[in-house]
């Protein structure tokens, strides 16, 4: 059950503040979902290249039923835990100060009452959508973490504005990307990457709600250590 709180109303374990949640269609029209969302899930994992999520909606006005998903629809919201004051501890997917998620499919359509439909909207980060529409055909020389940063940030590829937290690679190879999607290209580079300061083999490229990471398993286990640097997007 999605709960909307203001101020000190959200004080129980598992509660959170979700001040608004809007669907923005490809024409820029805004549909207020605040009171028809019954469930919201956000997924992140070191085994996933992008953050994804889903919301379950009960729709008595057929607002979503008329929506043809074109990959341009967005979900905008702000999510925080009770008592959170630091902006960096919030999930800001608002239009004004953050980056909304993109809807990529609708599933589980069913009628649950007279004139009432229920749907699940699946959404993902902007980079997830860019990955579906872009290919990389490029040769890279030098440190492999630099190649990853280029694929993540350059306009021709993922064009991400999010921060990348990375561990420098110890090997500098020439690598040729043979017309792959950006995530596949980065995963290929990750498999060939060697840490600069440990004996591990292979890196993980993943997204959290705050940023992207490119680091070895040892670095993940040690969390943020002195050999992990921050690169602003």
In which residue ranges do the predicted regions lie?
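Acidic/histidine-enriched alpha-helical segments
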Residues: 204-216
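Assembly/oligomerization scaffold segments
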Residues: 1-133
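Short, conserved phosphate-binding/catalytic loop or strand-edge motifs used
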Residues: 125, 160-173
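Amphipathic, non-transmembrane alpha-helical segments in extracytoplasmic/periplasmic proteins
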Residues: 54-55, 123-124, 132-161, 177-205
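Single conserved hydrophobic/aromatic residue that forms the stacking wall/gate
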Residues: 224-232
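Generic beta-strand structural signal
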Residues: 117-121, 173, 210
């Amino acid at each position: 059950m999605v709960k909307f709180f203001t101020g000190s109303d959200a004080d129980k374990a598992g509660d959170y503040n979700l001040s608004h949640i809007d669907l923005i269609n490809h024409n820029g029209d805004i549909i207020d979902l605040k009171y028809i969302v019954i469930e919201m899930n956000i997924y992140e994992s070191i085994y996933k290249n992008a953050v994804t999520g889903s919301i379950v909606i009960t729709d008595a006005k057929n607002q979503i039923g008329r929506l043809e998903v074109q990959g341009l629809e967005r979900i905008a919201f702000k999510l925080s835990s009770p008592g959170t004051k630091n902006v960096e501890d919030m999930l800001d997917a608002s239009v004004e100060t953050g980056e909304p998620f993109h809807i990529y499919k609708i599933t589980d359509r069913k009628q649950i009452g007279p004139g009432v439909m229920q749907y699940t909207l699946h959404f993902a980060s902007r980079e997830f959508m860019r990955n579906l529409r872009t290919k990389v055909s490029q040769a890279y020389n030098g440190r492999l973490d630099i190649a990853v940063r280029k694929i993540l940030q350059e306009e021709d590829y993922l064009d991400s504005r999010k921060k990348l937290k990375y561990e420098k690679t110890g090997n500098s190879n020439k690598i040729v990307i043979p017309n792959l999607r950006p995530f596949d290209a980065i995963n290929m580079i990750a498999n060939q990457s060697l840490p600069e300061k440990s004996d591990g083999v292979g890196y993980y490229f993943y997204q959290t709600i705050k940023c992207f990471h490119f680091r070895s398993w040892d670095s993940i286990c040690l969390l943020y250590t002195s050999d992990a640097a921050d690169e602003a997007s």
